Amino acid sequence: MKLANYVYGQWIEGAGEGAALTDPVTGEALVRVSSDGIDVARALEFARTAGGAALKALTYEERAAKLAAIAELLQAKRAEYFDISLRNSGATEGDASFDVDGAIFTVKSYARAGKALGAGRHLKEGGRVALAKTDVFQGQHFLMPLTGVAVFINAFNFPAWGLWEKAAPALLAGVPVFAKPATPTAWLAQRMVADVVEAGILPPGAISIVCGGARDLLDHVTECDVVSFTGSADTAARMRTHPNVVARSVRINIEADSVNSAILGPDAQPGTPEFDLAVKEIVREMTVKTGQKCTAIRRILAPAGVSRALADAVSGKLAGCKVGNPRSEGVRVGPLVSKAQQAAAFEGLAKLRQECEVVFGGDPDFEPVDADAAVSAFVQPTLLYCDKGLAARHVHDVEVFGPVATMVPYADTRDAVAIARRGHGSLVASVYSGDAAFLGELVPGIADLHGRVMVVDAAVGANHTGHGNVMPTCLHGGPRARRRRRGVGRSARAGDVSPPLRRAGRPRGAGSPVA
């Protein structure tokens, strides 16, 4: 079966044989995708004219009602999406929930936020500002929807959440969506869009999806559009310098490689709640989605005198995690999504091993449960130890997108700050400490290079949402998630639909009507 693309209000199969999407446990080919023959320029123009006009004619609360209907539909088909996640991504039930339920929760959050925005079609920002000695001439800022398309080039790890965490604020803002999911796991995103289209929830052109290669997509975006990319730093670099993107000053939001940190405070000794909470969170981040999360912990910073004990504690927990076919009882860690991702993980792991010792795992020949290692895409959870600190290179520059993390001991707070900053900006850091003096120096020292800093102490306990969870009510992002022309990048939060909106200043006479 070949998955069709939804463009110019029609379902169209791409030409040729296309690429196969496989089961990463068995290697079985499931479906095929192709974007060959799709007129991307026509698809984008149809979205701008038909989809954009229809969405902008609706009020915020009307758009919010459509998001609520989408969430209800996705919830009703949750079991079908879990099955696709299992077959195409090798997801355990917990992994599928993280993606699918996360998507549904996010859409619901934006639906609630949009309803609260009321019957307007654009937003006033702040009050009137005097521009003259008297109030006869004033200014007012507005947030206006872009007249173009929100183009999403998404990553393979979250085909559901990755689509809807971007699409929900765009649709709420009145901007049509053009989604290009990552090829290896495109099936789930395509099915969700197909279900929404079949239900007739959105007007024609409000959402489009193309599965397969991006081809000439960036040749046809304009200054009225916004492009959002999640993926590798290498691809991101090519996108930033694409001739059309540069020539037309296209807004582009990039979320690329990120070596996120978990940082243990000097007070978090073995036996303390903070130590135990750190162990639990590190293991969870290494195993949920098999470590295939942009926000996953890649570096573990711990006081030199405690680092070995922390490594032993994490290793002990990892030893109890069953790795194998998610269809088998008790399996906690599934495969990576493809053999290509497995090869990339092994390549990155080889670089890390040049300056690290292996504390746990790292065996390329380990035997997963109920799976053939020769055809499956498993990587054993691996904990490394690097005592080179700032002198190390790969540990701070290479993100192994899998169940791999590196323990890095630090000498004092200043050293911890320097090591965390050596990642050149990350999406998130989590800190496990109740030491006010330590936190007072560390958090301000790393905040400007992190999209989010989560502090966990004994009082917080297990009530926190998690190091790697992205909440629609809270910003995340950072220097590794940049927007051209907008400064430090971030992800939108519910109630903040500004990413697909454009700020405009409007000087006016004091007696002029407010739009």
Curated annotation (Swiss-Prot):
Q: What is the annotated quaternary arrangement, including any partners?
A: Homodimer.
GO MF terms listed in the record are: oxidoreductase activity, acting on the aldehyde or oxo group of donors, NAD or NADP as acceptor
Summarize induction of expression. By benzoate.
Q: Which family does it belong to?
A: Belongs to the aldehyde dehydrogenase family.
What is this enzyme's catalytic activity, as reactions?
(3Z)-6-oxohex-3-enoyl-CoA + NADP(+) + H2O = cis-3,4-dehydroadipyl-CoA + NADPH + 2 H(+)
Q: Where are the membrane-spanning stretches?
A: none
Q: What is its EC number?
A: 1.2.1.77
Compositional bias (Basic residues) at which positions? 479-488
Look up and give the organism this protein is from. Aromatoleum evansii
Which residues are annotated as active site?
Answer: E255, C294
Query: Annotated region Disordered: where?
Result: 470-515
* Class of enzymatic activity (EC top level): oxidoreductase
Stretches of Low complexity bias are at: 489-515
> What is the name of the protein in this document?
3,4-dehydroadipyl-CoA semialdehyde dehydrogenase
Which InterPro entries does the annotation name? Ald_DH/histidinol_DH, Ald_DH_C, Ald_DH_N, Aldehyde_DH_dom
Q: Which GO terms describe its biological process?
A: catabolic process
Function (record text): Catalyzes the NADP-dependent oxidation of 3,4-dehydroadipyl-CoA semialdehyde to form cis-3,4-dehydroadipyl-CoA.
Q: Give the record's keywords alphabetically.
A: Aromatic hydrocarbons catabolism, NADP, Oxidoreductase
Highest taxon, organism lineage: Bacteria
What Pfam family is a match for this entry? Aldedh
Q: How pH affects activity?
A: Optimum pH is 7.2.
